[in-house]
């Protein structure tokens, strides 16, 4: 705990009135890019059954979640203090963005860990139908995450409102895949552990999409405040 506080103090000392916007935005953008990378690599290596890679990715996801949690616990108040001369809206949207980032990274950590545990315990591989449905959701989510990451990196949010259509389509794909899996389970076409992991993966994918969209919106408002 002392080490975490010390790191926070060091970050705080580096922040000035002039660079506070850039420092805070960089923190959010960098973490979101890492989340996208770890998520994509986790799914790809799950399809390939690469146990070693999945272990490394689960560890990376845990580190990202811990870092995000530290920022959330120790950085908010010191940074808000530095924002005293700025608008209240700026502080509000920064807090909200960190909250959504923290939720998204915790979800990613659970997602990656559950997948690694499943593969490490040599449970039954997903069926072709499960993989096909999951790939459809995964492709839609990656496309959406890429859009959000592009906005965060460039600071240009003109297309943000248009992503709502893609977001809704993703949620519909998740709902469809969930219903198809429930039907498979009812017909005893998949094992219990396989069904549980599959449904958990879909739920976390949906949750991450919602949280990243929310943090992108708050980052947009934070920069504009």
Regions found by a protein language model. Give the residues of each.
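Cytosolic, long alpha-helical scaffolding segments
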Residues: 1-225
């Amino acid at each position: 705990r002392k080490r975490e506080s010390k790191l926070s103090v060091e970050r705080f000392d580096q922040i000035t009135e002039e660079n506070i916007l850039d420092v805070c935005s960089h923190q959010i953008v960098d973490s979101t890019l890492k989340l996208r990378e770890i998520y994509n690599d986790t799914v790809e290596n799950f399809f390939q059954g690469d146990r070693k890679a999945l272990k490394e990715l689960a560890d990376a996801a845990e580190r990202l979640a811990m870092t995000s949690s530290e920022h959330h616990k120790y950085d908010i108040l010191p940074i808000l203090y530095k924002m005293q001369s700025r608008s209240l809206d700026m502080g509000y949207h920064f807090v909200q963005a960190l909250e959504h980032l923290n939720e998204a990274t915790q979800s990613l950590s659970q997602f990656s860990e559950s997948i690694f545990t499943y593969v490490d315990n040599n449970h039954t591989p997903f069926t072709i139908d499960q993989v096909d449905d999951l790939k459809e959701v995964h492709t839609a989510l990656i496309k959406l995450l890429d859009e959000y990451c592009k906005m965060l990196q460039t600071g240009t949010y003109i297309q943000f409102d248009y992503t709502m259509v893609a977001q809704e389509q993703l949620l519909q794909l998740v709902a469809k895949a969930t219903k198809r899996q429930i039907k498979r389970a009812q017909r005893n076409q998949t094992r219990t552990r396989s069904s549980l992991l599959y449904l958990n993966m879909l739920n976390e994918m949906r949750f991450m999409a919602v949280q990243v969209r929310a943090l992108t919106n708050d980052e947009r408002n934070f920069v504009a405040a």
